[in-house]
UniProtKB/Swiss-Prot annotation:
UniProt domain Globin: residue ranges: 2-148
Pfam families: Globin
GO molecular function terms listed in the Swiss-Prot or TrEMBL record: heme binding; metal ion binding; nitrite reductase activity; oxygen binding; oxygen carrier activity; peroxidase activity
EC nos: 1.7.-.-, 1.11.1.-
Gene name of the record: MB
Role of this protein: Monomeric heme protein which primary function is to store oxygen and facilitate its diffusion within muscle tissues. Reversibly binds oxygen through a pentacoordinated heme iron and enables its timely and efficient release as needed during periods of heightened demand. Depending on the oxidative conditions of tissues and cells, and in addition to its ability to bind oxygen, it also has a nitrite reductase activity whereby it regulates the production of bioactive nitric oxide.
Listed PROSITE patterns: GLOBIN
Keyword Transcription: no
Record text on subunit structure and interactions: Monomeric.
Presence of keyword Metal-binding: yes
Binding site for O2: 65
Residue sites binding heme b per the record: 94
Keywords noted in UniProt: Cytoplasm, Heme, Iron, Metal-binding, Muscle protein, Oxidoreductase, Oxygen transport, Transport
Protein name from the UniProt record: Myoglobin
Length: 154
């Protein structure tokens, strides 16, 4: 399940492009998540009033949360699988406070790959996409394990 050094390099190379416009990427990812999977919006009390793409696009709060999401994910990805210290507090809040199901982590993982592929098609070919899928799967599996430690079946 682990990634090779080459796969981690592919993940971190494309992640550098994401970080060059983290607000734009984060906003696009959350907008797409809520549009493709409207049920996920139920977990975000402060975004429930955002029912149209126009409202989502205009929301500074949504943009700000997108930065938070991708900043945290970036910290985890940069650990190349050795992310226990970064993952544990994130899993704890997502399990005990926000109660985010693992299925929603799958949804956002799919959306992350779609959005990166749209924004960076020339730099995010099949090999890079496969590496990112593996990295996000590792993240989700480790989150699911931590969820169980916190008593959340998610």
């Amino acid at each position: 399940m682990g990634l090779s050094d080459q796969e981690w390099q592919q993940v971190l190379t494309i992640w550098g492009k994401v970080e060059s416009d983290i607000a734009g990427h984060g906003h696009a990812i959350l907008m797409r998540l809520f549009q493709d999977h409207p049920e996920t919006l139920d977990r975000f009390e402060k975004f429930k009033g955002l029912t149209t793409p126009e409202q989502m696009k205009a929301s500074e709060e949504l943009k700000k949360h997108g930065v938070t999401v991708l900043t945290q994910l970036g910290k985890i990805l940069k650990q190349k699988g050795k992310h226990e210290a970064e993952l544990k507090p994130l899993a704890q809040t997502h399990a005990t406070k926000h109660k985010i199901p693992v299925k929603y982590l799958e949804f956002i993982s799919e959306v992350i790959i779609k959005v990166i592929a749209e924004k960076h098609s020339a730099d995010f070919g099949a090999d890079s996409q496969a590496a990112m899928k593996k990295a996000l799967e590792l993240f989700r599996n480790d989150m699911a394990s931590k969820y169980k430690e916190f008593g959340f079946q998610g």
